[in-house]
Amino acid sequence: MRSLERTRNVPVLAICDGEDNARMIRGLEIGVNDYLMRPIDSNELHARARTQIRKKRYADRLRDNVQQSIEMAITDALTGLHNRRYMESHLSTLAEQASSRGRPLALMILDIDFFKSINDTYGHDAGDDVLREFAVRIRTSIRGIDLACRYGGEEFVIVMPETDIQVAGMVAERLRRSIAGETFAVNKGTKRIDVTISIGLATLDNKGEPVADVLKRADIALYRAKHDGRNRVVSTAA
């Protein structure tokens, strides 16, 4: 029972004979929460059962609060993607794994074009609608092993393990088309607007390159994409 996730925290109340101390002690050692001795008093049984139920509910609330606190610390509240803090700590681990195994790792920085204009024209609520829908489209365009996060404002980062620059470029282009090809509903669906993105791509060189340098090269590629007219993907070689 304790070995199964779904029953691990279920309270266990044991009933023992008065002379069976060894079994009672063994039960407590393996996870029994409380016990009663025969003959059973129904009032005592009900009281002990209610106590264990209260303890279980309190422990469940504590676990939920801890889990919620952890999620809030690593998740962007608006989009539901990982936040910058989580990305920066996890990226180092992914880069170390890629370098030690001699495997490719690609990174892209995505920026929503003219996002300030969206806020100025349609309001900040519309801007939030765009960010949320953008996050949804990111999730549908990447794999489970990829790491997507909101980097800040209208910038997002996607880290793709086991992915070379050619494959990452195809993923980036597919994502760019999915954004530009379908309008975004804003202001509770009362209006639909066109949105485009610019993407900068870079890959880890597997020669001990700091991850900060990979991010910098992706950012330079993003700058080129925006400088060259936006709504495009630009990659930079390692």
State the predicted function of each range.
Residues 135-136, 167-185, 217-219:
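Alpha-helical scaffold within the catalytic cores of cyclic-nucleotide enzymes
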Residues 3, 8, 17-34, 145:
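Alpha4 helix (beta4-alpha4-beta5 surface) of REC/receiver domains from two-component response regulators
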Residues 39-49, 167:
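C-terminal output helix
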Residues 147-150:
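A short pre-motif secondary-structure segment
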Residues 165, 169, 204-238:
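Catalytic-core segments of nucleotide cyclases and related cyclic-nucleotide turnover enzymes
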Residues 97, 140-145, 177-190, 203, ...:
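Short catalytic/binding micro-motifs of nucleotide second-messenger systems
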Residues 70-71, 84-104, 135-143, 161:
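Short regulatory alpha-helical coupling segments
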Residues 70-89, 110-124, 132:
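Conserved nucleotide-binding and Mg2+-coordinating catalytic segments in signaling enzymes
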